[in-house]
């Protein structure tokens, strides 16, 4: 029984590592395909822009191109700094656009695969992802049979699809650069 429990724990850790690697790979592709921020209706209009307002500016650009931005991917550190801001006296600011884990109605997802200072704002319907179940295989190579060793390979096969016409529905933004654009000159 102990060996079976140990095997199941090792298998679960192995599967989690493969799935995390797979998720990070998908995020990397989405970031690489993301359209850069250009300009929005909020540019040059804000006194104290923050991460949340930068994300909303990107949302306005995406929505202006007939997409519906409904998802934000951010580094956990950026999410915390977005949620907890203070005024000049040190009082916590209540942000009307930040409620129930959402920014202006967009669901926020946290991932360390996103660099600090970067956010992805997107219409989640523009990507389609198909994948296999987690596959675990065992085998031997070279002299492993002689040494009584085996190798384990964990895999997930995945296809991430997006039509070229839908690429503007995903925007990868540098939060500081967008905040600088939003600032009143």
Feature annotation, model-predicted:
Residues 6-7, 85-88, 164-171:
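Composition- and surface-driven signal marking solvent-exposed, interaction-prone regions
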Residues 1-64, 178-185:
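Alpha-helical scaffold segments that mediate packing/assembly in large oligomeric complexes
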Residues 143-185:
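Protruding loop/beta-arch "assembly-hinge" segments enriched in small, turn-prone residues
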Residues 38-156, 161:
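Extended oligomerization regions of viral-like shell subunits
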């Amino acid at each position: 029984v102990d060996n079976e429990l140990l095997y199941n724990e090792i298998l679960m850790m192995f599967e989690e590592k493969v799935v995390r690697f797979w998720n990070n790979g998908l995020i990397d592709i989405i970031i690489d395909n993301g359209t850069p921020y250009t300009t929005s209706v909020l540019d040059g209009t804000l006194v104290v822009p923050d991460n949340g307002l930068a994300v909303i500016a990107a949302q306005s650009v995406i929505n202006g191109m007939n997409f519906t931005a409904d998802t934000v991917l951010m580094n956990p550190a950026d999410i915390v700094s977005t949620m907890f801001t203070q005024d000049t006296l040190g009082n916590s600011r209540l942000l009307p656009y930040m409620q129930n884990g959402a920014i202006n109605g967009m669901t926020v997802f946290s991932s360390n695969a996103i660099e600090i200072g970067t956010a992805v704002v997107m219409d989640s319907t523009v990507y389609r992802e198909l994948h296999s179940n987690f596959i675990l295989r065992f085998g031997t190579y070279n002299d492993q049979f002689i040494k009584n060793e085996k190798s384990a390979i964990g895999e997930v096969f995945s296809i991430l699809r997006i039509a070229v016409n839908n690429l503007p529905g995903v925007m990868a933004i540098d939060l500081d650069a967008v905040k600088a654009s939003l600032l009143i000159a």
